[in-house]
Amino acid sequence: MEAPAQLLFLLLLWLPDTTGEIVLTQSPATLSLSPGERATLSCRASQSVSSYLAWYQQKPGQAPRLLIYDASNRATGIPARFSGSGPGTDFTLTISSLEPEDFAVYYCQQRSNWH
């Protein structure tokens, strides 16, 4: 069995909103997976954020890259293996079959609206 290439680290983010503090909790904290496997990452909001949820990927020394916006829409140039679901309080980012370049940090972000 091939050893996992790397770990996916997730962050816990607190983001203010006009209605008060919204806490986004990502799980699991880490995933140990190999290329070709399926990755499922969860983000739970302490109150409904409708569909205003985005997923980002970040690699060392690079700026965050937008993957998914409005819960389920892929950003320009993002491969179809990335998909998102929502809305409400429970969101999921799925990578259907991991490629070596997918091993990175992933995090979710809530915004009250998009500008």
Curated annotation (Swiss-Prot):
<dbReference type="InterPro" id="IPR050150">
    <property type="entry name" value="IgV_Light_Chain"/>
</dbReference>
<dbReference type="GO" id="GO:0005576">
    <property type="term" value="C:extracellular region"/>
</dbReference>
<comment type="subunit">
    <text>Immunoglobulins are composed of two identical heavy chains and two identical light chains; disulfide-linked.</text>
</comment>
<feature type="region of interest" description="Complementarity-determining-3">
    <location>
        <begin position="109"/>
        <end position="115"/>
    </location>
</feature>
<dbReference type="InterPro" id="IPR013106">
    <property type="entry name" value="Ig_V-set"/>
</dbReference>
<dbReference type="GO" id="GO:0005886">
    <property type="term" value="C:plasma membrane"/>
</dbReference>
<keyword id="KW-1003">Cell membrane</keyword>
<dbReference type="InterPro" id="IPR013783">
    <property type="entry name" value="Ig-like_fold"/>
</dbReference>
<feature type="domain" description="Ig-like">
    <location>
        <begin position="21"/>
        <end position="115"/>
    </location>
</feature>
<dbReference type="InterPro" id="IPR007110">
    <property type="entry name" value="Ig-like_dom"/>
</dbReference>
<keyword id="KW-0732">Signal</keyword>
<dbReference type="GO" id="GO:0019814">
    <property type="term" value="C:immunoglobulin complex"/>
</dbReference>
<keyword id="KW-0964">Secreted</keyword>
<feature type="region of interest" description="Framework-2">
    <location>
        <begin position="55"/>
        <end position="69"/>
    </location>
</feature>
<keyword id="KW-1064">Adaptive immunity</keyword>
<keyword id="KW-0391">Immunity</keyword>
<dbReference type="Pfam" id="PF07686">
    <property type="entry name" value="V-set"/>
</dbReference>
<feature type="region of interest" description="Complementarity-determining-1">
    <location>
        <begin position="44"/>
        <end position="54"/>
    </location>
</feature>
<keyword id="KW-0393">Immunoglobulin domain</keyword>
<feature type="signal peptide">
    <location>
        <begin position="1"/>
        <end position="20"/>
    </location>
</feature>
<feature type="region of interest" description="Complementarity-determining-2">
    <location>
        <begin position="70"/>
        <end position="76"/>
    </location>
</feature>
<keyword id="KW-0472">Membrane</keyword>
<protein>
    <recommendedName>
        <fullName>Immunoglobulin kappa variable 3D-11</fullName>
    </recommendedName>
</protein>
<dbReference type="InterPro" id="IPR036179">
    <property type="entry name" value="Ig-like_dom_sf"/>
</dbReference>
<dbReference type="GO" id="GO:0002250">
    <property type="term" value="P:adaptive immune response"/>
</dbReference>
<keyword id="KW-1015">Disulfide bond</keyword>
<dbReference type="InterPro" id="IPR003599">
    <property type="entry name" value="Ig_sub"/>
</dbReference>
<comment type="function">
    <text>V region of the variable domain of immunoglobulin light chains that participates in the antigen recognition. Immunoglobulins, also known as antibodies, are membrane-bound or secreted glycoproteins produced by B lymphocytes. In the recognition phase of humoral immunity, the membrane-bound immunoglobulins serve as receptors which, upon binding of a specific antigen, trigger the clonal expansion and differentiation of B lymphocytes into immunoglobulins-secreting plasma cells.</text>
</comment>
<dbReference type="GO" id="GO:0006955">
    <property type="term" value="P:immune response"/>
</dbReference>
<feature type="region of interest" description="Framework-1">
    <location>
        <begin position="21"/>
        <end position="43"/>
    </location>
</feature>
<feature type="disulfide bond">
    <location>
        <begin position="43"/>
        <end position="108"/>
    </location>
</feature>
<keyword id="KW-1280">Immunoglobulin</keyword>
<feature type="region of interest" description="Framework-3">
    <location>
        <begin position="77"/>
        <end position="108"/>
    </location>
</feature>
